Swiss-Prot record:
PANTHER family: TUBEROINFUNDIBULAR PEPTIDE OF 39 RESIDUES (PTHR28585:SF1)
Function: Plays a role as a potent and selective agonist of PTH2R resulting in adenyl cyclase activation and intracellular calcium levels elevation. Induces protein kinase C beta activation, recruitment of beta-arrestin and PTH2R internalization. May inhibit cell proliferation via its action of PTH2R activation. Neuropeptide which may also have a role in spermatogenesis. May activate nociceptors and nociceptive circuits.
GO cellular component: extracellular region
Tissue specificity comment: Expressed in testis and, less abundantly, in liver and kidney. Expressed in seminiferous tubuli and several brain regions, including nucleus ruber, caudal paralemniscal nucleus, nucleus centralis pontis, and nucleus subparafascicularis thalami. Expressed in neurons of cerebral cortex and subcortical areas. Expressed in Purkinje cells of cerebellum.
Annotated protein name in UniProt: Tuberoinfundibular peptide of 39 residues
Protein source organism: Mus musculus
Main location (coarse class): secreted
Subcellular location: Secreted
Record note on quaternary structure: Ligand of high affinity for the PTH2 receptor (PTH2R).
C-alpha cells in the first residue's frame, strides 16, 4: 500500500503549526516536563550492540526512563484538565453574574 504525500504550501504549514500550538496544553508548573522522551528511550537495542535482554541494566534503565516520562506526561495532562475545569467553572460564574 502506497502513501500519497501532498506537498503543502508554507501558508498551510504555518496554519498547522499554529493549530498545534493552540491544541497542545503548555504547562508552566513543576509537573510539566518533556512531553516525549528522547529518541531511543523505548528501544532495548543500543546502537552498535547486540539485543539487550530483559534483565540487562540497559533495558531496566530504558524502562525507568519511559516510566518517568509517562508519569510526567500524566501529571501534565491532569494539571491541564484541572486548569480547564477551573476555567469552565469561572466562566460559568461570570455568565450567571451577567445574566439579567
Amino acid at each position: 500500500m502506497e502513501t500519497c504525500q501532498m506537498s503543502r504550501s508554507p501558508r498551510e504549514r504555518l496554519l498547522l503549526l499554529l493549530l498545534l500550538l493552540l491544541l497542545v496544553p503548555w504547562g508552566t508548573g513543576p509537573a510539566s516536563g518533556v512531553a516525549l522522551p528522547l529518541a531511543g528511550v523505548f528501544s532495548l537495542r543500543a546502537p552498535g550492540r547486540a539485543w539487550a535482554g530483559l534483565g540487562s541494566p540497559l533495558s531496566r534503565r530504558s524502562l525507568a526512563l519511559a516510566d518517568d516520562a509517562a508519569f510526567r506526561e500524566r501529571a501534565r495532562l491532569l494539571a491541564a484538565l484541572e486548569r480547564r475545569r477551573w476555567l469552565d467553572s469561572y466562566m460559568q460564574k461570570l455568565l450567571l453574574l451577567d445574566a439579567p
